[in-house]
């Protein structure tokens, strides 16, 4: 069997998603999902036919929502497939390099490892901003730069001006990919308005977070017409199933967009409530500012708290293994009941810190 497996695959460490880790509990605050069940109803009687390669009705709906023309949109199976197809399309194995800035979303690293792509890794600064000085030193001959915006797991935006400086400083053969998985929580900061200004700019979007549709795996790549045409060459022949496209189309009708925006306001309200209450807990050392539907918290001793929360049936995401995030846990913003339960459990903690 060893002879069958390429060396870079045999040593590969897969992405540890919340579901893959598989810890069981009663309150899940570990995957940055919407805490509310989507009310979309669906019935199918057309499952005997293959779906459209790129469902036109869905393209039209997302075009209206995003303000991006239809021919500048590619529908993918979540933003993760967007990362995968961009890397696979534009990078040659063991030749090309990508760049990213940890601690950040780990799929940039995992997909580079899958396709045996070289990596230039520039850690962010202690203030969670981009290290422009070191980026400029190592930016030559990089094929793709991935920027998570707002960043996961830190929750903050990188300086827009610094990102523009990076785009202006690279050659036309370097692609800048802005991962906007969480942008709906602060939509006014989107880079969509810059698409027509830069030929090498790509934006990733998803319906998993603000739209509450994590289960259907539906994302979008936004770029110029030429890049979208190239990506279509590599995309699977039937990437979006009929049930997925039908549900996504419904989610993008005006009524459901209004509900999504209402849920965002609920999340922001719950986040403020949660932060205000957590500030009263003495063993919490820092609550980092977040523009997303989660917060990053530094504890006096995170491993103890992580295990304690599991014992109480509350599942959060351990980030203490990530560079610069010692004793940090990432907590998704849940319902007001879930937030209050988390506060109650943390408030009565009597263990050793």
Swiss-Prot record:
* GO MF, one example: histidinol-phosphate transaminase activity
- Enzymatic reactions: L-histidinol phosphate + 2-oxoglutarate = 3-(imidazol-4-yl)-2-oxopropyl phosphate + L-glutamate
GO BP terms: L-histidine biosynthetic process
Record keywords: Amino-acid biosynthesis, Aminotransferase, Histidine biosynthesis, Pyridoxal phosphate, Transferase
Which InterPro entries does the entry mention? Aminotrans_II_pyridoxalP_BS (IPR001917), Aminotransferase_I/II_large (IPR004839), HisP_aminotrans (IPR005861), PyrdxlP-dep_Trfase (IPR015424), PyrdxlP-dep_Trfase_major (IPR015421), PyrdxlP-dep_Trfase_small (IPR015422)
The coenzyme or cofactor needed here is: pyridoxal 5'-phosphate
Q: EC number(s) of the enzyme?
A: 2.6.1.9
Q: Which residues carry this modification: N6-(pyridoxal phosphate)lysine?
A: 209
Q: Write down the top EC class of this protein.
A: transferase
Pathway connected to this protein: Amino-acid biosynthesis; L-histidine biosynthesis; L-histidine from 5-phospho-alpha-D-ribose 1-diphosphate: step 7/9
Pfam families, A to Z: Aminotran_1_2
The regions listed as transmembrane in this protein's record are none
| Gene3D superfamilies hit by this protein | Aspartate Aminotransferase, domain 1 (3.90.1150.10), Type I PLP-dependent aspartate aminotransferase-like (Major domain) (3.40.640.10)
What is said about its interaction partners and assembly? Homodimer.
The record's comment on protein family reads: Belongs to the class-II pyridoxal-phosphate-dependent aminotransferase family. Histidinol-phosphate aminotransferase subfamily.
By what name is this protein known?
Answer: Histidinol-phosphate aminotransferase
**What is the source species?**
Buchnera aphidicola subsp. Cinara cedri (strain Cc)
Q: What is the lineage of its organism?
A: Bacteria, Pseudomonadati, Pseudomonadota, Gammaproteobacteria, Enterobacterales
């Amino acid at each position: 069997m060893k002879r069958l497996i390429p060396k870079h695959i045999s040593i590969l460490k897969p992405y540890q998603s919340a579901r893959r880790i598989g810890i069981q509990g009663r309150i899940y605050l570990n995957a940055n999902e919407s805490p509310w069940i989507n009310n979309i109803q669906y019935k199918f009687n057309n499952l005997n036919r293959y779906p459209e390669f790129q469902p036109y009705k869905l393209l039209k709906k997302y075009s209206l929502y995003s303000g991006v023309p239809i021919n500048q949109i590619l529908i993918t199976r979540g933003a993760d497939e967007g990362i995968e197809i961009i890397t696979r399309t534009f990078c040659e194995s063991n030749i090309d390099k990508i760049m990213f800035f940890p601690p950040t979303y780990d799929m940039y690293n995992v997909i580079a490892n899958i396709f045996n792509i070289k990596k230039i890794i520039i850690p962010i600064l202690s203030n969670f901003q981009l290290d422009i000085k070191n980026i400029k030193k190592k930016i030559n001959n990089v094929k793709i730069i991935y920027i998570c915006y707002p960043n996961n797991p830190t929750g903050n935006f990188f300086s827009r001006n610094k990102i523009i400086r990076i785009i202006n400083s690279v050659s036309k053969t370097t692609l800048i990919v802005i991962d906007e998985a969480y942008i709906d929580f602060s939509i006014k900061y989107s880079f969509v308005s810059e698409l027509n200004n830069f030929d090498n700019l790509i934006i990733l979007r998803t319906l998993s977070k603000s739209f509450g549709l994590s289960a259907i795996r539906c994302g979008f790549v936004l770029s110029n017409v030429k890049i979208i045409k190239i990506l279509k060459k590599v995309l699977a022949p039937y990437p979006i199933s009929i049930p997925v496209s039908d549900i996504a189309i419904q989610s993008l009708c005006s009524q459901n967009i209004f509900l999504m925006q209402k849920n965002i306001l609920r999340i922001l309200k719950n986040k403020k409530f949660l932060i205000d209450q957590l500030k009263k807990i003495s063993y919490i050392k820092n609550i980092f500012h977040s523009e997303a539907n989660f917060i990053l918290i530094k504890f006096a001793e995170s491993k103890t708290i992580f295990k304690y929360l599991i014992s109480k049936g509350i599942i959060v995401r351990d980030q203490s293994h990530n560079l610069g995030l010692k004793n940090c846990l990432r907590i998704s913003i849940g319902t007001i009941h879930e937030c209050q339960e988390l506060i109650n459990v943390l408030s009565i903690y009597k263990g050793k810190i």
